[in-house]
A protein has these predicted regions:
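Non-catalytic terminal and boundary segments that flank Rossmann-like NAD(P)-dependent oxidoreductase
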Residues: 1-23, 97, 121-140, 147, ...
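C-terminal helical subdomain
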Residues: 2-5, 150, 223, 227, ...
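Canonical Rossmann dinucleotide-binding motif of NAD(H)/NADP(H)-dependent dehydrogenases/reductases
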Residues: 8-50
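Catalytic loop of short-chain dehydrogenase/reductase
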Residues: 26-30, 112-119, 123-153, 172-219, ...
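Conserved glycine-rich Rossmann-like NAD(P)H-binding loop of the short-chain dehydrogenase/reductase
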Residues: 46-62
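The beta1-alpha1 cofactor-binding region of Rossmann-like NAD(H)/NADP(H)-dependent oxidoreductases
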Residues: 57-58, 78-92
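A short, exposed helix-loop element centered on a Lys and neighboring polar residues
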Residues: 164-165, 210
């Protein structure tokens, strides 16, 4: 696959990226959410756009070329976000490409999905299968499915944590504020079946803004962070389900196109960074297949501690 996006569809009235140095992880794959966000930055006045990818190098290079043809200063960055040495090696390169400074906005979008499996449930039996064959099949499925879940969780959780540690550290050291935007999913708070690694990974990153603030302490004014919970967007990973309302119907009349999701994100990011800081924002989809209406809401993840009557009545005393 190569670059196929319509650049003009990503031109929006909002000025969220104007004059900013923007780095987007997981933005190389054609037709992906990351690509949409990178194009939104490029088409709406970003000073520099960093397009990160790991394996989607052909799509990524083609997109960077398209941006440059439109007069945008853009560069490609290849790295494994779960490899700390890879990321550290990219640091000086990114700063060089951004004319001696770190990014103003870091959008963490790296992530994978799962093909789906019967989490916590036994595999159905196959007629005529011997006990030995079933045991071998169950073992293989167990190993392969959990390996996939681990990769999904590592890519999202480790990737986001590593990028945050790297660029927050640069921001604090150089006294230059940075804004982190973490791309999560509606499934983080409304889990779907068969994709446990994906759900857990997207839930975990919702805590990152608070974790960052707590660790920065007095320097927390140098880095702000928020999480975006997106509904289903039609990408290479979701294309096969685009016509299946059983997959997305509880949230939306149809899957969003990447430029629609990018427009909504651009609208949200046009708000002041301190207004968005520590927030978890959910993108709702209303309307019909022919005409959708996208609206943001803020999700409060509050911890409520309730006493247990039986324990109050019989505490353990020592």
């Amino acid at each position: 696959m190569a670059y196929t996006a319509d650049y003009d569809k990503f031109k929006f009235p909002e000025g969220a990226f104007k004059g900013k140095r923007v780095l987007i992880t997981g933005s190389g794959k054609d037709g992906g959410i990351g690509q949409g966000l990178a194009l939104a930055a490029a088409a709406n006045g970003a000073a520099v756009v960093g397009v990160h990818f790991h394996s989607s190098y052909r799509d990524g290079f083609d997109m960077v070329d398209a941006m440059r043809k439109n007069g945008v200063k853009a560069f490609a960055m290849q790295a494994d976000v779960t490899n700390t040495r890879d990321l550290w090696a990219s640091r000086s390169y990114v700063i060089e490409q951004m004319e001696g400074q770190g990014p103003d906005i870091v959008i963490c979008n790296s992530g994978l999905t799962e093909k789906g499996y019967r989490f916590g449930r036994a595999l159905p039996e196959i007629d005529g299968e011997s006990r030995a064959e079933r045991r071998a099949r169950v073992r293989r499925e167990f190993i392969e499915n959990l390996a996939e879940s681990k990769l999904v969780m590592d890519t999202k959780i480790d990737g986001f944590v590593y990028m945050t540690h790297l660029w927050a550290g640069e921001a604090v050291y150089h006294n230059h504020p940075v804004q982190f935007v973490y791309i999560s999913s509606m499934q983080s708070i409304e889990p779907g079946v068969a994709v446990p690694g994906y759900v857990v990974a997207n839930w975990a990153v919702l805590r990152l803004p608070e974790v960052l603030k707590t660790n920065l302490g007095k320097a927390s004014n140098m880095a702000s962070a928020c999480c975006l919970m997106l509904p289903f967007v039609r990408t290479g990973m979701t294309e096969e389900y685009a016509g299946n309302a059983k997959v997305f119907g509880r949230w939306q009349p149809r899957m969003l196109e990447p430029f629609e999701a990018a427009h909504a994100v651009s609208q949200l990011l046009s708000r002041p960074a301190d207004e968005l800081n520590l927030g978890n924002f959910k993108l709702g989809v209303e309307g019909t297949v022919d005409k959708v209406s996208l609206k943001w809401s803020q999700v409060k993840l509050e911890v409520k501690d309730e006493a247990l009557g039986w324990s109050d009545a019989n505490p353990v005393v020592s």
